[in-house]
């Protein structure tokens, strides 16, 4: 029986564009499930990559009520499906899925930072975004910055003290 890997993004475009061909390749070694907000791209992913998809609405902007509902849906999904690994990209999907995976004790919880929002924010918003990224890292077992610039910011802003691993040569 193959280990179950969930790949998660806030919007399906991220899975469809950034991971083009990767899900299909990974499905040779894992039972891959793509999780993202509903949309036509989910059907494209299912057909092109040959993986199962699950739609869970997630807002890109901060929305406490909708974010809480998305978190609960992810918790229910993980409790039911019992994935071996959860690997997220995009900030909101990272926060929600790492928290849900931590709560449901998924053994491998990986987040790839494909960019950071907080360096361009100011004041209370920057502090909130930093806190969110720190929580994402706290809940993750593995953290992958997409390149040296993102890695440098994660270190300089003290987001995490966990090891940071750039995949291959970086830059998604």
Indicate where each model-derived feature is located.
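N-terminal subdomain of nucleotide-sugar transferases
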Residues: 1-37, 49-51
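Active-site proximal beta-strand in glycosyltransferases
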Residues: 3-9, 101-116, 144
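Nucleotide-sugar donor phosphate/pyrophosphate-binding loop at the beta->alpha transition
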Residues: 14-19, 65-72, 107-108, 117-139
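Conserved nucleotide-sugar phosphate-binding/catalytic loop shared by glycosyltransferases and other
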Residues: 28-66, 161-168
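A short, active-site helix/loop in glycosyltransferases that binds the activated sugar's phosphate group
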Residues: 40-44, 139-172
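Glycine-rich phosphate-binding loop signature in dinucleotide/nucleotide-binding domains
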Residues: 77-84
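Short His-centered aromatic/hydrophobic patch
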Residues: 88-94
């Amino acid at each position: 029986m193959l280990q179950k890997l969930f790949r998660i993004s806030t919007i399906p475009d991220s899975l469809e564009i950034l991971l083009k061909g990767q899900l299909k390749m990974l499905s040779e070694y894992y039972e891959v499930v793509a999780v993202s907000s509903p949309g036509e791209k989910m059907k494209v992913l299912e057909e092109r990559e040959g993986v199962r998809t699950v739609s869970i609405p997630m807002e890109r902007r901060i929305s406490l009520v909708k974010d809480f509902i998305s978190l609960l849906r992810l918790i229910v999904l993980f409790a039911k499906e019992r994935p071996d690994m959860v690997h997220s990209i995009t900030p909101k999907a990272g926060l929600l899925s790492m928290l849900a995976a931590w709560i449901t004790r998924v053994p491998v919880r990986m987040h790839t930072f494909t960019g950071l929002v907080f360096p361009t924010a100011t004041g209370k918003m920057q502090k909130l975004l930093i806190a969110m990224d720190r929580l994402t890292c706290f809940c993750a077992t593995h953290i992958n910055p997409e390149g040296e610039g993102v890695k440098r910011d994660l270190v300089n802003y003290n987001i995490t003290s966990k090891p940071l691993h750039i995949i291959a040569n970086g830059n998604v």
